[in-house]
Every structure is written in structure tokens, then in C-alpha cells.
Amino acid sequence: MATNITFHPGSVTKEERIKFVGHPGMTIWMTGLSASGKSTIACALEQYLLQRGVTTYRLDGDNVRFGLNSDLGFSEQDRNENIRRIGHVAKLFADACVVAVTSFISPYRKDRDQAREFHKKDGLPFIEVYVECPVEVAEQRDPKGLYKRARAGEIKEFTGISAPYEAPISPEIVVSSHTQSIEECVEKIVNYLLEKDLITLK
């Protein structure tokens, strides 16, 4: 980190921003295996919240690798950096009173915990959502053909096959995409946000 820099605070307070936008920001961090349903649930949740007056933006694991993280591969070190960057980006969205919905495998607990700490430091809500799905089911879905390629040895360090996935120990929310519909998963997340008074629907 550079040492010849100074943080420049703005003139808009958190309270003012919440008043103008209409609600506080937060990050809803979805984690789970590839093909567990993270992106599908995130898309549905974004649509649901936007249609009800909640400013929401989705950050997708594949999408950010086309730009911001295009220089990163899938080694453990690169995965760590991938999540570190997105943790900061999500925090910026949350600070702007946007509900950031992230869908990243984010296989390592320490990386997810680090993202949580970024938010905690600035008093921003961080809701970890574990999208639970047995690897057998995810492999059967395999919409991108990645599991097949991993089994064939064409993809090294593939989460769930040749690289570990560390499931959350105490996430705020658990949804089971193999037993619950997309609508049921979204409903469970929204109900949590309402119960915690984090959002108000129009």
C-alpha cells in the first residue's frame, strides 16, 4: 500500500445519504459451489428488490473477471485477491446506500471473513448467504460443462473437485437450491432483511 496518500472524506454524511436514497446500503454475499444457483438467485433477488424500490446492484463472479479482475487466474493466491478486491467494491456500493448482491464461489472462509471485516469497520451490514447444494447435484447440473472438464483434468484447481470449498460455519442465511425453488430462496432472504429492518418495500 502506498504511504504518500491521505484519505479525503466527503461532505455528505451517512445519515444524509440514507435520507436521500431512502434506505441504507448493505452487502448480501452469496457463496457456494459452482452451479449451486448463486447467480440465478442473485438475479431474481435483484429484480425483486428493484421492482419494490430498493436500489440494488449485482456483482457476479464471472462478470468481474472480464474487467476488474481480468488479470487473475484461479490459484489460491489469485482467488484470495479476487475476493479481496470484490470485498472492497461491494463495500463501496454499500457505502453509497446500494444493496450489493454478490455471487462468488469465494471458497475460503478467511477471505469471506475479511470481506465482512471491511464492512464492519465502516458500520455496514454484511449478510452471508450460503447457497447449499451437494456437489453431486451441482455436477449433474453443470450448465457450463466445467465439472466435466475438471473431471477430465482440463481444469486445474476446480472447487469441489480438485480444490477445497470451506462452507460457512454461521452464515446469516442458508438456502438449499436443491430442495427449494428460486422463489423460495428469494423469499427467505427478503424475509430476513425485513425482520432485521434493513429494507422497506414499496
Curated annotation (Swiss-Prot):
tRNA processing as UniProt keyword: no
Catalytic site: S103
Highest taxon listed in the record's lineage: Eukaryota
A GO CC annotation given for this chain: nucleus
The protein's Enzyme Commission number: 2.7.1.25
GO MF term list: adenylylsulfate kinase activity; ATP binding
InterPro entries, per the entry: APS_kinase, P-loop_NTPase
Residues involved in ATP binding: G32, L33, S34, A35, S36, G37, K38, S39
Keywords carried by this UniProt record: Amino-acid biosynthesis, ATP-binding, Cysteine biosynthesis, Cytoplasm, Kinase, Methionine biosynthesis, Nucleotide-binding, Nucleus, Phosphoprotein, Transferase
Gene deletion effect: Leads to methionine auxotrophy.
Pfam families assigned: APS_kinase
Signal peptide range: none
Subcellular location: Cytoplasm; Nucleus
One Gene Ontology term from the biological process aspect of the record: cysteine biosynthetic process
Catalyzed chemical reaction(s): adenosine 5'-phosphosulfate + ATP = 3'-phosphoadenylyl sulfate + ADP + H(+)
Similarity remark: Belongs to the APS kinase family.
Function field: Catalyzes the synthesis of activated sulfate. Required for methionine synthesis.
Name of the featured protein: Adenylyl-sulfate kinase
Originating organism: Schizosaccharomyces pombe (strain 972 / ATCC 24843)
Top-level taxonomy: Eukaryota, Fungi, Dikarya, Ascomycota, Taphrinomycotina
